[in-house]
Amino acid sequence: MRHYEIVFMVHPDQSEQVPGMIERYTGAITGAEGKIHRLEDWGRRQLAYSINKLHKAHYVLMNVEASQEVIDELETNFRYNDAVIRSMVMRTKHAVTEASPMVKAKDERRERREDFANETSEETEAGDSEE
């Protein structure tokens, strides 16, 4: 079995269908003795350019280990599913399990926001105790 990185973009009006789609695709992979090494739902993001007059899409990234037959089946599903705007399947040399730069940046922003919130709450507590 080979390693693949799969990214697909879903129509923003169909975002509520994404969990079901992920479940269906991961079920097809694991049902054929494949493995899911990384699964990231990036959510709704701005597109770099318009696709079919759309400016946003729901992104999903998967790193999997699967046979060629399963990948062909997934590509066929992407092609005939009207909710999938674009998809890309790339073969990789090895399994990628670490978080993608998109998720790392999101976690970093969350940590900064929490640190800022903690600092401001400490300052307000210090201000309250001085009175």
Swiss-Prot record:
Region described as Disordered: spans on this chain: 98-131
Pfam annotation, one family: Ribosomal_S6
Record field: compositional bias (Basic and acidic residues): 104-116
GO biological process, alphabetically ordered: translation
Cited CDD domains: bS6 (cd00473)
GO cellular component labels: cytosolic small ribosomal subunit
Source taxon at top rank: Bacteria
Segments of skewed composition (Acidic residues): 120-131
An MF annotation (GO) of this entry: small ribosomal subunit rRNA binding
UniProt similarity note: Belongs to the bacterial ribosomal protein bS6 family.
Function: Binds together with bS18 to 16S ribosomal RNA.
Name of the protein: Small ribosomal subunit protein bS6
Species name: Edwardsiella ictaluri (strain 93-146)
